[in-house]
From Swiss-Prot:
The lineage of its organism: Bacteria, Pseudomonadati, Campylobacterota, Epsilonproteobacteria, Campylobacterales. It comes from Campylobacter jejuni subsp. jejuni serotype O:23/36 (strain 81-176). Its EC number is 4.1.1.11. It catalyses: L-aspartate + H(+) = beta-alanine + CO2. This is Aspartate 1-decarboxylase. Belongs to the PanD family. Is synthesized initially as an inactive proenzyme, which is activated by self-cleavage at a specific serine bond to produce a beta-subunit with a hydroxyl group at its C-terminus and an alpha-subunit with a pyruvoyl group at its N-terminus. The active site is at S25 (schiff-base intermediate with substrate), Y58 (proton donor). Heterooctamer of four alpha and four beta subunits.
Amino acid sequence: MNITLLKSKIHRANVTEARLDYVGSISIDEKLLQASGILEYEKVQVVNVNNGARFETYTIATQEEGVVCLNGAAARLAEVGDKVIIMSYADFNEEEAKTFKPKVVFVDENNTATKITNYEKHGAIF
């Protein structure tokens, strides 16, 4: 049996752009993708902290520093300045699931990684 677990998370990133007239996806600073272990074109779940919206899309890496841009229909689900949590998931067998720890990237107001951990303390946001 496989179990789906959180693999990676970029925590409370600031939306820097929202482009409705784009094909789709979420563009993310490639440095944040690398730090989190999220791959380009990987399916992600995005949660808007400001309005509670949750949606799935895929990532596009950008070389523009600090960019987190919602593209296409997703642009309707957040405004510039909203905080979002970007998460990817992976399937593990039961033995792998017992020891796996997700990678969590915390960012500042400029979407620069300030802390990278392989665990997350529940109840704390920083």
